Amino acid sequence: MTRRILIMGLPGSGKTFLARELCDQLMSRGMSVTHLNADAIREQFNDWDFSAAGRLRQAQRMRDLADSATADLVIADFVAPLPEHRVIFDPDYLIHVNTIDQGRYADTNQIFQAPACCDFVVTTQDADHWARQLINCLFNK
């Protein structure tokens, strides 16, 4: 069964850098990994709607794509600004990239709610370091 990691946080916090580094490190250890980047998915579906309905649709789309993956692990990086977006995606592991106080977009800053509970909090923009920490914490128990 494919496990899902959601790497979430404000735009510009370093989610994609961390997701890519984590994918690389896990693949070098022999795991099959699928990376879902929200911006790439929006581009693929030509859906740049950031309304409440558009954000919900994107969360469901990310979930559907994760559900159809055949890899050992799906790593998704997207803002997921509200708790309901995270519930829709239903991650096995929730990683909050909490490296900035304000993102690039005022509308996202206004609605963003940090998770009350998560599996791991990233506090600096050092993808290599945090990818190693995540692997140790999540996979070497």
Residue ranges and their predicted role:
Residues 4:
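Walker A (P-loop) ATP-phosphate-binding motif of ABC ATPase nucleotide-binding domains
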Residues 7:
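Hydrophobic anchor at the beta1->P-loop junction of P-loop NTPases
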Residues 11:
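The conserved Walker
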Residues 15:
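Conserved lysine of the Walker
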Residues 19-64:
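Conserved substrate/cofactor phosphate-moiety recognition/catalytic segment
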Residues 48, 53-105:
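Glycine-rich phosphate-binding loop used to anchor ATP phosphates in small-molecule kinases
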Residues 88, 97-141:
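Small-molecule kinase domains that catalyze NTP-dependent phosphoryl transfer to phosphate-bearing small molecules
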